[in-house]
Each structure stands twice: as structure tokens, then as C-alpha cells.
Amino acid sequence: MAVKVLVVDDSGFFRRRVSEILSADGQIQVVGTGTNGREAIEQALALRPDVITMDYEMPLMDGITAVRNIMQRCPTPVLMFSSLTHEGARVTLDALDAGAVDYLPKNFEDISRNPDKVRQLLCEKVLTIARSNRRSISLPPLPSATSSSHAPASSSSVGASARVGAGASPAPASTSAAPKRKAYRLVAIGTSTGGPVALQRVLTQLPANFPAPLVLIQHMPAAFTKAFAERLDKLCRINVKEAEDGDILRPGLALLAPGGKQMMVDGRGTVRILPGDERLNYKPCVDVTFGSAAKAYNDKVLAVVLTGMGADGREGARLLKQGGSQVWAQDEASCVIYGMPMAVVKANLADAVYGLDDIGRHLVEACQ
């Protein structure tokens, strides 16, 4: 059965273009279009699509307000289109907090050297998020990142796509044994689709005196990572910044890999930022950072693979395991997309599998 898609944008040209691209894929059926947020809600209720694509800047009602309403009334995976600017990044992160599952730059065809490949990416994203965990996106929206810097985090200060919606049963408790305590020299966390909210959920549980350095690898465009790091820094008690070449790892500091580049660490505790290798699908790539950590710290790394499509992180996890380090994976019930964690689990590389709400607490227990 074809995936039913609702396309919402105030630009007639863009609605037609997105509809043409999606309709060219035999697995996708465009069942309706809308020109603003109000129409998005009306059409979502009437047509019950499997996926909605939506712009964030529209008349009458903006995309973020529409997403919040849709998540409350008929939870549906939403793919947001955004601009590759700092402001576009901020708005996109707000949309993810409101319940959107993924995003693409609005000029996705123009910025690619291979338009055919990026058109295929749009279809792949739609097909993938159509299979996303609806229970994990069905939450009322949460406030945007306006809290004071490093204030204690409350359970309500995190985004929507990681939580269980009204009327749904809670995710099952983690079945893995208590985490092994060890003097870890590094905590490395890798993620993709659903990651911005998942990282927010985990990191806001860490105390300001968290005893280990952290590196974060989130598949994200170059224009977005600085805004995302700033957002996390406002919400978390630990410090968070976008990594720069030469940064020094230190306890209580999380360094986010910059988009479009690769991040590596060395045994002296120094971060190296390298140009993105065109041969790699992801920039930043979880495998690259995990692999460098395995070489630098042997058995002193605690790695966590969170929600995301694909299998990035699996080979890096294999190297970490060969050196004696610990690898955790997020459980299927709490993932938006159970791809990257599943790859680690199926390869028998996960020492523990935890629900998203348990990971932060277990990190504290393991590293104290």
C-alpha cells in the first residue's frame, strides 16, 4: 500500500514541485495539499495521511503551531522544510520540539551537486518517517529553549518526540543490568533522526559536575549545529558548545560535532575537526568519531547510540568493543526511528539497551 502524503506550503510552485517528486515514486501517493497551518490541520483530520511535509513560515497559522495542533489531535509524522540559516535552524529545532520528526532544507535541489540523489533522499525520508514510532511523537508541545543557562532541568523542559502521548501506555522499563561503573575518560553519543530531542532528553539529566567529557555526533547540516549547541547549552546544567579544532576535552563539557565536517579525538584529550570526506555518507559521521575514540582510549569509552535511520555507529561500536569499551543502545519502544540502535543490537555489540528516559540516569551512575 502506498504511503499517503499531505503537502503543505504557501508557495504554489513548491507545493507542485514536492508533489511531483513524491508522486514519481510508486510507493508514495500525494493525497492532498494545503497552503497554511489551518489547512494542514483540517486536511490531516480529514485525510489521515501517513506523512505531512510542511513549511514553517506560512500565513494564517505557521508550521510550528500547526505541528503542535496536529500532534495533539491526530499524531502524524511531519517532515519540515527550513532555510539553511541560523534563524532557520532555531525554528527547525522548535518544530522538532513540537513533534516534527525530520527536516530538509527548502532549497534541497539547488544546494546539491546531484539533484537526482537529493530528490531520492526526499522520497527516502518520507518512506522512513512513515514507519516511525507514532507513540513517540504524539506529545503536547513543550516550551522552546528560553530557560536560564544551566538551570536545573525539569522533566517538562525537553522536547516532544521522545515522550509517550496521552492515552498511550508507557514504554517498557529497561531490562538490561545496572551499568558497569568505571573511570571513563569519554562519553560519546551518536544519533540521527529524532536525535535533537533525544539528546536534549538525555543531557538535561546530567549534573553540572558530571565527571566525564562528552562528544556528541548528530547528523545535521553545517548551518544548524551551532544553533543546536547553543540551545542545549541553555537547557543543560553541563556546558555544551559546537566543537572547534583544538578544543580540549574536560569533565562537564559536551562538544557537538560541526555539520559538514568530521570530529576526531586523540589520546591527549584534544579534538580534531577535519573536512568532510565526500566518500562518507554522513558529515559528521558517528563511526569516524567512535573509531578515533577507540584508538585514543581503548577500554575507557562509554558510547551510546540513540534513535536514527541507517547503521552509522555500528562499525565504530565494533572498534570500541574490540578495545574493551562499553556500548549502549536506545530501545526500540522509545526511538523515533529504530535504525542505528537496531544495527548495534543486531550485531551483538550492545552491552545494555535502555529506554530514553533511563539513559541519563544510567550515565550518571556509570560515571560517578
UniProtKB/Swiss-Prot annotation:
Residues 4-121 form the Response regulatory domain. SUPFAM superfamilies: CheY-like, Methylesterase CheB, C-terminal domain. Disruption phenotype: Deletion mutant is nonchemotactic. Mutant is not attenuated for virulence in C.elegans whereas in vitro motility and chemotaxis are severely impaired. Residues 172-368 form the CheB-type methylesterase domain. Disulfide bonds: none annotated. Its main location: cytoplasm. GO terms for cellular component: cytoplasm. It comes from the Bacteria. CDD domains: CheB_Rec, REC_CheB-like. It catalyses: [protein]-L-glutamate 5-O-methyl ester + H2O = L-glutamyl-[protein] + methanol + H(+); L-glutaminyl-[protein] + H2O = L-glutamyl-[protein] + NH4(+). It is found in: Cytoplasm. The modification 4-aspartylphosphate is found at D55. The active site is at S192, H219, D312. SMART domains: REC (SM00448). Involved in chemotaxis. Part of a chemotaxis signal transduction system that modulates chemotaxis in response to various stimuli. Catalyzes the demethylation of specific methylglutamate residues introduced into the chemoreceptors (methyl-accepting chemotaxis proteins or MCP) by CheR. Also mediates the irreversible deamidation of specific glutamine residues to glutamic acid. Belongs to the CheB family. PANTHER family: PROTEIN-GLUTAMATE METHYLESTERASE/PROTEIN-GLUTAMINE GLUTAMINASE, PROTEIN-GLUTAMATE METHYLESTERASE_PROTEIN-GLUTAMINE GLUTAMINASE 1. This is Protein-glutamate methylesterase/protein-glutamine glutaminase 1. The gene is cheB1.
